[in-house]
Amino acid sequence: MPRRKSLRSQLLINGIDKSLLSDDSADSSDIDEEEVYGVWTEEPFQKEAGRSYYRSLKKNDVIYRVGDDITVHDGDSSFYLGVICKLYEKAIDKHSGKKYVEAIWYSRAYAKRMEIKPEYLLPDRHINEVYVSCGRDENLTSCIIEHCNVYSEAEFFSKFPAGIPTKRKDLFPCNFFIRRGVHLKVNKYTEPLDWSYYAHNLERIEDLLVEMEENLRPTKKKSGSRGRGRPRKYPLPNVESKESSSKVNSKDENFDLQDDSESSEDNLTIQPQTPRRRHKRSRHNSSNLASTPKRNGYKQPLQITPLPIRMLSLEEFQGSPHRKARAMLHVASVPSTLQCRDNEFSTIFSNLESAIEEETGACLYISGTPGTGKTATVHEVIWNLQELSREGQLPEFSFCEINGMRVTSANQAYSILWESLTGERVTPIHAMDLLDNRFTHASPNRSSCVVLMDELDQLVTHNQKVLYNFFNWPSLPHSRLIVVAVANTMDLPERILSNRISSRLGLSRVPFEPYTHTQLEIIIAARLEAVRDDDVFSSDAIRFAARKVAAVSGDARRALDICRRASELAENKNGKVTPGLIHQAISEMTASPLQKVLRNLSFMQKVFLCAIVNRMRRSGFAESYVYEVLEEAERLLRVMTTPDAEAKFGELILRRPEFGYVLSSLSENGVLYLENKSSRNARVRLAIADDEIKLAFRGDSELAGIA
């Protein structure tokens, strides 16, 4: 399999390490707050409104100061760039150790958000260019990844005359330059600026942002008639929109962002106009009528899942060998090469490459149990195809990922796809009409679009209209839509989907078998290649973890989590990971907080969850109606073998309204999703894996005969 050329930033810290929180409150002292949030290097210089402000923070032996340029993990396998403007802690969080950072964001010239509409792009943008923006917000210091270097244009090219090629993993993701500012809400840029004047000087950066807000913000029309006095003068902002800048020839060295229509004068005079004749007023007094309230038309953008980013080298990582190992073993980190999936990679790559080259639509169905590398393999294929597209060996294409576990309803998939294609946020019904019109009509400028529909099981509805549309659009002659469906069930099309949908999937199917213990050993050893000389893991420990996981599920993610937890245990004992520590980590993971919550549920809550699982397996749908689950619960209680089953069943019949409280409590605890709490026809589905419920209720004496 070819090695990916694209580089992605290293995610050393993914928020709070979840394995640190896997035990109960008695073990809370094991949480290393210094590792997660860092420590202050000095006393606060200011206290105001319940906050204490500091000038520097030490985290993982690295000092971060106000004015430093950093990369920040965004919580979804990607990263942002910004400059630190504030470091502080809140009085209410002082005992928890939480510390906060406020950053002014930089927007990358080749980021996804900058490639929404081609007419908004600058013709001379560079792969290492970032723009200073007006956006800023608050984040936990646990999200800080590392320092980065942001130069002016002259400094950058004096240091790197030929630029930084993407193959330089040690330089490419952490060196950038700034020559313009951007206001993303109005799609306007500033004139070229010398960033060396602003670098590491927050006062000058703040003045620049104020000037950008004044000059780049959208103009608002003023109501009322204009007087006959002196003509008003409106100063022209010294900026230009993206639309006008895209019309300038990129080969011109004297590239100017000002519009050609601007003259040398600073002000533009607008002559007064004759006011229109006033219409005859109504008899009703307008002061007695209630005015219609104005509605804010802004819509929060949908959460579109980005591709995971490639890790950097750990040569300069400040930390112990065990910390390096845990960073490499994290499920969010992406290795340099994908192990043990060469055949599946080649099949998926050839299918997508041929569809993009021929500019045709296609459907591909990928199935396999959780943790077998389905999504990771598709991401690997997409990154290689994008690299070929950037090199000009493949036509341009767009990529959109829709995760069934991250949408509240299946119809939201329409809005996500439309927003990914156009950048416009519309309702699901409107988006469906727009997409149908787009894919049924030809367009000479349309490029191919690859849609990854992950967790397809969660997008199955009773009428199956969403899946039918997504699998039918690729068959249209002008759609150029390529749908890659990923599900955990191999026979999902035959068992659940109707014949009209199954026929559109065709014979393009790629099954993923569970990993064997040999493959799991290879995967773990490849992750630990960077710390092999430190002798952190023994070969017997890796072999023991691989065999334990392969005997149960073959889930690579579970194997990596077990090894990470064993590394923490070994670091506390100043030793290396042994089979005994692997066994201890496995025992702790089976006693996770989720398992404890499920085991401590009431009898009625347990019966309801068992009924949902049975209903899912019987119907094949992730969603069920409340009345269907109630009927399933009654059926389960009839077959119970416990001595007091009849008494409990009678209580259920007499006090059936209690299920309303059961539903509310399970929904509030995040165990299930509930559409409408007050209706028996409401739809309900699990918010956790059904395997967690089976593991928690196995051996429960109250549920004998049904669980």
From Swiss-Prot:
| Chain positions found as Phosphothreonine | 292
Sequence ranges assigned to domain BAH in this UniProt record:
62-193
Q: Which residues lie within the region annotated Disordered?
A: 216-302
Checking CDD domains in the record gives: AAA, BAH_Orc1p_like
A GO cellular component annotation in the UniProt record: nuclear origin of replication recognition complex
Q: Which residues bind ATP?
A: 334, 368-376, 455, 488, 557
Q: Which residues carry this modification: Phosphoserine?
A: 291, 320
Q: Give start-end positions of Basic residues composition bias.
A: 218-233, 275-284
List where Acidic residues composition bias occurs.
255-265
**Localisation per UniProt entry:** Nucleus; Chromosome
The entry marks the following residues as binding Mg(2+), namely 454-455
Subunit field text: ORC is composed of six subunits. ORC interacts with cdc18, recruiting it to the ars1 origin of replication. Interacts with sbp70.
User: What family is this?
Assistant: Belongs to the ORC1 family.
Q: What is this protein called?
A: Origin recognition complex subunit 1
